[in-house]
Amino acid sequence: TEDPIVIAGGPCATANPEPLADFIDIFVIGEAEPILDELVNQLIDYKKVKRNTEVFADIDGVYVSQSLNAVKRVWTQNLDETMHPVAQQVPIVDDSSPFMTIFGRTLAVEETRGCSRSCRFCLLRHINFPMRERSLKKVESIIVEGMRNTHVSKVSLIGASIFDYSHLEDVCEYIVFHGYELSIPS
């Protein structure tokens, strides 16, 4: 049988991929959106012609432990231009079920990425800078389409530094005005 290619990303992989290098073939350093198309195309080519995983190291933001290439962290500069899920899975279990997700029956909407603070102890500040925001217009359109597709009554605002979002009050008013419940998780 053929071994699958194992890909990892996220805060821990971005901060220090080496401890998992024996188990992971490819690490995405930073955010996947800017390189997702290129990575998927390379995976398709890789499946057709078996090669060494080092070919992935030529993609910005991809770390392959066997490669000696320096890795540049990739990040989305304009959140308005990047995709956001507008049809989210909602558990079909009782609210008291241990299988209910932490956010429950809600539409999770990301307003910000990164953080404007410079806390020395915070991993997120160092790997996910600079802070970026979605425009109010974009957030509203995500909510409209997401609520239509997801069939829930609650919107959760997601962001590492959500209270620094310049349109927080406006988006909260928008959600409440349209009769939805509002959640701002810590």
Q: Where do the language-model regions lie?
A:
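Conserved SAM/AdoMet-binding glycine-rich loop
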Residues: I143-S186
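Active-site lining segments that contact anionic ligands and/or coordinate catalytic metals
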Residues: I59, L79, G104-A108, S116, ...
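N-terminal [4Fe-4S]-dependent radical SAM core
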Residues: S65-A108
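Canonical Radical SAM [4Fe-4S] cluster-binding loop centered on the CxxxCxxC motif
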Residues: M100-K137
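Conserved, mostly hydrophobic/aromatic
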Residues: D25, C115, V139, I184
